[in-house]
């Protein structure tokens, strides 16, 4: 579910080549943690793994990838990805 990011915008701001830090703890929105980046609002559909640091959103570089849905990847933990959704 959710909205889609137009491909030209996605290519400019998202993907492996565009890591970023969320900087603030994701706030609850509609029962899910939400963060903002690149002019878009995202909810974390999956929980983040327990082994991620308590301050991962401040300390870790992450990026958004599309693979039949949007996923948040953490460069410090390359084996894990979190399903996310674009919301307004």
Predicted regions mapped to residue ranges:
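Low-complexity segments
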Residues: 1-88
């Amino acid at each position: 579910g959710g909205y889609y990011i137009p491909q030209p915008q996605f290519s400019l701001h998202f993907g492996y080549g565009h890591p970023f830090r969320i900087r603030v703890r994701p706030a609850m929105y509609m029962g899910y943690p939400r963060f903002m980046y690149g002019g878009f609002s995202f909810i974390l559909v999956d929980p983040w793994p327990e082994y991620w640091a308590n301050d991962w959103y401040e300390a870790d570089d992450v990026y958004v990838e599309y693979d039949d849905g949007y996923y948040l990847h953490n460069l410090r933990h390359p084996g894990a990805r979190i399903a996310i959704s674009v919301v307004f």
